A protein has these predicted regions:
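Flavin-dependent oxidoreductases
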Residues: 16, 141-214
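Dinucleotide-binding Rossmann-like beta1-alpha1 core, especially the glycine-rich loop
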Residues: 13-91, 213-214
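Glycine-rich FAD pyrophosphate-binding loop
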Residues: 1-9
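Helical element adjacent to the flavin cofactor pocket in flavoenzyme catalytic cores
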Residues: 104-162, 170
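Short beta-strand
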Residues: 8, 45-49, 183-185, 210
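General beta-strand structural signal in soluble alpha/beta enzymes
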Residues: 81-84, 132-134, 165, 211
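Residue-level detector of anion-binding/catalytic polar loops
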Residues: 79, 131, 181
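A short, glycine/Asx- and small/polar-enriched loop/turn
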Residues: 61, 92-100, 142-150
Length: 214
């Protein structure tokens, strides 16, 4: 198919930093940094909004987890502030904080247009010499004795040194072609779009993304 014709086009496009794995935190930090520069480097609009995000804690276990994750983020250079209820209201004046013990405010978070980001990545890849083949289904992959990979497509076979499984929702099927079980499960998410909310518009600033565990 075309680029972004699968699940990408209707993704939320949220770019978070908050994660407890050091290696994944490094990847998140790199990705967020890349998205802030991608439009300038490629000329392709990405819709980046660096609005930050607040993740809320409702019990002591979550508070303890927030302290742990902040330690991880400090190691990779991602800015994270642990806020009390009054401080949360300063960042997000419209948020009702009753019942919350703490908020983890990651200032480098944001959101993008997933389709725009994908197209920008494609532009950057082509600028670096990559070739992109559209509407060309992969039907099989084979590991050759040389250590190279043979990728069988509907329009011919490609031999490559490295094969990256970036099939998204279909990565399990692509993994099976190589005899690999990919531990991935698809999940259904919901979102709704609202009309303009006068109270939000009156603030004249973009509010951070809020993650409520309840």
């Amino acid at each position: 198919g075309e680029l972004t014709s699968g699940s990408t086009w209707h993704a939320a496009g949220l770019i978070p930093h908050f994660i407890g794995s050091l290696n994944m935190a490094k990847l998140h930090f790199y990705g967020a940094d890349l998205y802030t520069k991608l439009e300038t480097e490629t000329g392709q609009a990405t819709g980046w909004h660096g609005c930050g995000a607040i993740r809320l804690a409702v019990d002591q276990d979550q508070v303890d987890w927030f302290h742990y994750v902040k330690g991880v983020l400090d190691q990779v250079g991602a800015e994270c502030h642990l806020l009390g209820p009054d401080e949360i209201k300063e960042v997000h004046p419209l948020l009702e904080t009753d019942g919350f013990l703490m908020g983890a405010y990651t200032t480098g978070d944001g959101h993008t247009d997933p389709s725009g980001v994908t197209q920008a990545m494609a532009v950057g890849a082509r600028n670096c010499g990559a070739e992109i083949y559209l509407n060309n289904r992969v039907t099989d992959t084979k590991l050759l004795p040389s250590g190279e990979w043979e990728v069988v497509t509907e329009k011919g076979t490609i031999v490559c040194e490295h094969l990256v499984n970036a099939a998204g929702s279909f990565c399990k099927q692509v993994g099976r072609m190589a005899g690999i079980k990919v531990p991935m499960v698809n999940m259904v998410h919901q979102y709704l779009m609202t009309e303009t909310i006068p109270e939000v518009a009156a603030l004249e600033k973009e509010l951070p993304v809020v993650r409520d565990p309840r």
